[in-house]
Amino acid sequence: MRKLVYLVLVLGLTFLNVRCKSETKQNKKEEQNIGKQYSSLENRFQKLVNYPVGANNFPRSMSLAPEVVHKVPSKDWTSGFFPGNLWLIHELTGDSIYKVKAQEWTVLMEDQKENDRTHDMGFKVYCSFGEGLKQDPDNQYYKDVIIESAKTLITRYNDTVKSIRSWDFNKDVWDFPVIIDNMMNLELLFEATKISGDNIYHNIAVQHANTTLKHQFRPDYSVFHVINYDTISGVVKTKDTHQGFDRNSTWARGQAWAIYGYTMSYRYTNNPKYLAQAEATTQFYMEHENLPKDGVPYWDFNDPEISDAPRDASAAAIVTSALFELYTYTNNKTYLDFATQVLNTLNSEAYLLKDTVNGPFILNHSTGNWPKNDEIDEPIVYGDYYFLEALKRKQNLILK
């Protein structure tokens, strides 16, 4: 496909004016740069493909001193990202060995399709089976698992609250918690309707997105992490955080989930309110006085010791991937330039793991759960997923 696009570009030079020639040269230069980027990442990619397959062996994060890979079973909310990483690397490189390994890991996620104790079905199933379906669109097995998973996920929907319940723990604290992360799981529902033709999944996803839009944001478009609803009346009981610094702070990854979630929701609905929300939350993020110059945020924008706070490369990767898509809907070059800058920053020695590190990860310097002192300044699997997706989206823009 890349060769075909390149050939079309070359043949078209005969008919292009000077400006178009300049733009074509720039595209070719960027395409060459992408090739160099993949070459520089090849050693890290090999660490992923050589990692041993196992049902309880999904790599979630990694300590570096000493080197210890933190492994989880398929029930963990992060388990679907590693199969997704392999699918994305296959798409980026065309090397079939990554597809073979992606298939082996993906089938290990099937046991989650009836797990009704989690809201993270999209992360688990769509990042694995969904990525597989993109590359094998006639695979009925993948379609069936996605549909069954969507059926399971909507059992957590409450029609009074008009949202999908997030966690089941802390029932003495929360009646019906909904976290901003949950926006990411709507993609599974939107796709389930496309596959099955049944609008129930799409409609529930829209209801959830509407409720979140109404209650989860402050006037400046920063996001609350957790909204607690009353299941009898549907009204908001409390607005809180679980992974941010405090209830009034802006947790960087939460803001990233919001940017990505409403950009993705616009893709499936063409609802201008979702596009406006994606742009407003992006503006808050990009213009925040505490965002470092390299575009990789501190774990929370309001950490009182901000200059010494750990960064969160995963949040940067999520936003970068989202902005490449948001650019296609708005033609706002500010988004493209910012995303390109941050992608280049992530794809540098400052954030890439050294070749000598043996774990199946790519990026360093992500922060998982600061309040619990868990996964601080470490490689984390979902950071890699959105980094790889951002690389792919950038490639698609260049080859378009």
UniProtKB/Swiss-Prot annotation:
Which locations, inside or outside the cell, does it occupy? Cell surface
Q: Which organism is it from?
A: Formosa agariphila (strain DSM 15362 / KCTC 12365 / LMG 23005 / KMM 3901 / M-2Alg 35-1)
- Cite the SUPFAM superfamilies for this sequence: Six-hairpin glycosidases
The family note in this entry says: Belongs to the glycosyl hydrolase 88 family.
Which residues of this protein are catalytic? 120, 181
Q: Domain of life here?
A: Bacteria
Q: A GO molecular function for this record?
A: chondroitin hydrolase activity
The entry's function note states: Unsaturated glucuronyl hydrolase involved in ulvan degradation. Ulvan is the main polysaccharide component of the Ulvales (green seaweed) cell wall. It is composed of disaccharide building blocks comprising 3-sulfated rhamnose (Rha3S) linked to D-glucuronic acid (GlcA), L-iduronic acid (IduA), or D-xylose (Xyl). Unsaturated glucuronyl hydrolase catalyzes the cleavage of the unsaturated 4-deoxy-L-threo-hex-4-enopyranosiduronic acid (deltaUA) at the non-reducing end of ulvan oligomers, thus forming 5-dehydro-4-deoxy-D-glucuronate.
Q: Name one GO biological process term.
A: polysaccharide catabolic process
Q: Which residues form the signal peptide?
A: 1-20
GO-annotated cellular components: cell surface
This chain belongs to the protein called: Unsaturated glucuronyl hydrolase
Keyword annotations for this protein? Hydrolase, Signal
Q: What EC number(s) does the entry state?
A: 3.2.1.-
